């Protein structure tokens, strides 16, 4: 492979990806080489004459598929952060080939028999716990990949996987295209009353970039949401809300000027039909059972009961929140009826009146250099590492690169940081692995992470400033990054986040969010963008008082998403009379107190479950929040003794029992090793201001 690595940067695995040199035309030739090598390795490993041993089977497959995963990971990453028509075409062309390869591995009966033989052999007893876990996971995944299906059913099962991958990609493309296509230009500055200065400035720059006068607003979140939250012009809020809520739907052309072919309605129905068929082929009653097989939660019923319990506890708080908001809007804002495009605006006004501060005021205290320094200080203090700037080729001039070292200077990991929203970059925030930790003979391959956000870029020569929510997002994604980077596991299949149950994956990310509510952390990491002053204690106290503002409504919103997702995959019939849009409305009516707009088509942009791997898994956020809140409570308990939540002894224990072990043991075992007991919901309720009243 090294010979062609000179000419094709995607085939060079000697170091970090050569981002400056990778071109769309490299994708297909690289995958030709890698898929060929991986297929041959699978053939060798599954051959009758190959001994059923770890080295001859598992290692052979792993060593050939890891480069494939890394190269395809780079292509997928670039497709998400630097989308061009050429790259999108190269990705789309090769996605079916990669899907087909993994499908064929998952269904390879001869390979499955080899894995079963290793698990039944004398060698199994001598394997490390990590290797046993990899084997056990593999056997489970083989079953879920259709390895036990009769031969004549396998082509159809493979077809299902390929069709689902293609539909996911189309869903995602449609959301991106519909979001990118919309622009609303305001020509009269008076219409912008209420908007923060930086939002107005960003809109002016966006219009200038197009060679236009006025202020350009888009459906990208940093442009769209300030309008919803601050604009006094109700018609402007409504215009943008309608465009946002109907993206990628049959109403898109009417409200957002999108194209009819970006409508995701049929894609959603098709995905649900295919998932249902897949579940039936595997002998499950529904797709939710398939989704939960590798997760912590034991059954759809357990998840539904968990969500129902949380909904019941949150409902009285949500009722109170909604009543307060409606009363305030009628009395103070002259809004007799709260329309959906009024909710964020009224909530922001009530929050400002009640707590006398705005998100925008807080934002000035978190310029990017201070926020990053704060994040790194927390990490260094708790986990005994050092974070330093480093050098590597990047895909955009705004991307930075860092290294994580132990105190003795030895390299632990590296990461890319891509913080700003821009054209051709998928919305949202995420962590992805560029390379996983693994031992190769006596050499350790250190992990590398991609950390991606979509914050507003710097304007007017000043550093970017982050809202408190954005600071929380930064800590959240870095928590995922730490899970990936601080692992001590040497086996690729269970190092870092590999092999971690999906509903436990959010534990380390949501755990980190808690530090964003601590006075000593925030005061030390704040520095006003103009004066350098630290966040005033008085402002912090207001933020804390406002922390659980409308947390009842926020909790019910998440329950609507989670319950919609779970019930959609338990007993919803995609071929039945009730469409997905109507079903979403039913769920909203059942669990939420805020009515849904008749034109809202939010399922059509629910990328988590239709393009992001969260199908029958969205509940994981709340499930993991129970774990993360309870884990954080250990630091609160330590602070009662030591005076600070930045308690190094507890941090060391957390690093050892949660972060370092990665996926090498069940998440429940890791949690119990850290906490000394099973998780309890009390800390979550307390952190959300919904602790049950004392009896």
Which residues does each PLM region occupy?
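C-terminal non-catalytic alpha-helical accessory regions
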Residues: 35-126, 556-592, 596, 615
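Membrane-entry segments of alpha-helical transmembrane domains in multi-pass membrane proteins
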Residues: 19-31, 53-58, 260-264, 303-307, ...
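Short pre-active-site segment immediately N-terminal to the catalytic Zn-binding motif
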Residues: 456-475
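His/Asp/Glu-rich acidic catalytic environments and adjacent acidic regulatory segments
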Residues: 3-33, 80, 89-298, 317, ...
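C-terminal, non-catalytic "cap/extension" segments appended to globular domains
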Residues: 2-29, 33, 193-194, 209, ...
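Active-site-proximal, well-structured secondary-structure segments within enzyme catalytic domains
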Residues: 130, 134, 166-169, 173, ...
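Short, hydrophobic/amphipathic alpha-helical patches that form generic packing surfaces
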Residues: 66-77, 140, 242, 343-349, ...
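Membrane-interfacial loop-to-helix junctions in multi-pass inner-membrane proteins
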Residues: 53-55, 86, 91-92, 263, ...
């Amino acid at each position: 492979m090294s010979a062609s690595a000179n000419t094709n940067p995607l085939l060079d695995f000697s170091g970090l990806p050569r981002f400056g040199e990778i071109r769309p035309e490299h994708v297909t030739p690289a995958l030709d080489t890698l898929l060929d090598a991986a297929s041959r390795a699978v053939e060798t490993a599954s051959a009758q004459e190959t001994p059923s041993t770890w080295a001859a089977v598992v290692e052979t497959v792993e060593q050939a598929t890891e480069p494939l995963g890394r190269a395809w990971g780079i292509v997928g990453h670039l497709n998400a952060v630097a989308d061009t028509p050429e790259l999108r075409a190269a990705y789309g062309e090769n996605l079916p080939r990669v899907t087909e390869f993994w499908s064929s591995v998952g269904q390879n009966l001869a390979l499955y028999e080899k894995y079963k033989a290793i698990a039944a052999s004398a060698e199994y007893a001598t394997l490390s716990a990590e290797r046993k876990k990899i084997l056990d996971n593999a056997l489970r995944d083989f079953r879920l990949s259709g390895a036990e299906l009769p031969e004549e059913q396998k082509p159809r099962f493979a077809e299902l996987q390929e069709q689902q991958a293609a539909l996911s990609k189309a869903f995602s493309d449609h959301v991106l295209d519909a979001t990118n296509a919309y622009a609303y230009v305001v020509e009269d500055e008076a219409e912008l009353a209420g908007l923060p200065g930086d939002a107005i400035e960003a809109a002016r720059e966006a219009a200038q970039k197009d060679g236009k006068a006025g202020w350009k607003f888009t459906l990208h979140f940093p442009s769209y949401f300030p309008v919803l939250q601050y604009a006094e012009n109700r018609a402007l809020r409504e215009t943008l809300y309608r465009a946002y809520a109907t993206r990628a739907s049959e109403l898109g052309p009417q409200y957002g000027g999108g194209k009819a072919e970006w409508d995701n309605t049929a894609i959603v129905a098709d995905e649900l039909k295919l998932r249902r068929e897949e579940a039936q082929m595997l002998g499950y009653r529904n797709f939710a059972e398939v989704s939960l097989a590798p997760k912590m939660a034991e059954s759809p019923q357990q998840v539904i009961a968990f969500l129902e319990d949380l909904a019941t506890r949150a409902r009285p708080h949500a009722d109170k929140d909604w009543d307060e908001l409606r009363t305030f809007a009628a009395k103070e804002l002259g809004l007799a009826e709260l329309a959906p495009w009024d909710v964020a605006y009224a909530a922001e006004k009530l929050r400002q009146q009640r707590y006398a501060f705005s998100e925008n005021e807080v934002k000035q205290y978190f310029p990017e250099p201070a926020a990053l320094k704060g994040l790194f200080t927390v990490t260094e203090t708790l986990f005994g590492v050092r974070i330093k700037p480093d050098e590597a080729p990047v895909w955009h001039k705004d991307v930075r690169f860092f290294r994580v070292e132990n105190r003795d200077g030895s390299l632990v990991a590296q990461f890319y940081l891509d913080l700003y929203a821009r054209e051709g970059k998928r919305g949202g925030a995420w962590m992805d692995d560029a390379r996983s930790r693994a031992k190769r003979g006596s050499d350790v391959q250190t992990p590398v992470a991609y950390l991606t956000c979509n914050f507003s870029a710097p304007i007017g020569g000043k550093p970017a400033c982050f809202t408190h929510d954005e600071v929380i997002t930064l800590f959240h994604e870095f928590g995922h990054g730490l899970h990936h980077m601080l692992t001590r596991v040497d086996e690729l299949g269970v190092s870092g986040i590999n092999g971690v149950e999906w509903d436990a994956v959010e534990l380390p990310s949501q755990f980190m969010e808690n530090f964003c509510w601590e006075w000593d952390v925030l005061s030390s990491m704040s520095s006003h963008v103009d004066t350098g002053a630290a966040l005033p204690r008085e402002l912090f106290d207001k933020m804390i008082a406002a922390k659980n503002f409308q947390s009842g409504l926020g909790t019910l919103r998440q329950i609507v998403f989670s319950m919609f997702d779970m019930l959609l995959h338990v007993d919803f019939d995609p071929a039945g009379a009730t469409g997905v849009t109507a079903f979403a409305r039913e769920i909203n009516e059942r669990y939420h107190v805020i009515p849904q707009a008749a034109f809202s088509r939010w399922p059509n942009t629910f990328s988590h479950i239709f393009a992001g791997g969260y199908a029958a898994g969205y509940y994981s956020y709340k499930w993991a929040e129970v774990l993360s809140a309870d884990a954080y409570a250990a630091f609160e308990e330590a602070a009662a003794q030591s005076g600070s939540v930045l308690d190094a002894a507890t941090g060391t224990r957390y690093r050892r029992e949660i972060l370092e072990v990665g996926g090498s043991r069940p998440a429940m075992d890791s949690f119990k090793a850290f906490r000394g007991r099973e998780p309890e919901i009390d800390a979550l309720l307390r952190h959300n201001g919904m602790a049950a009243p004392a009896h």
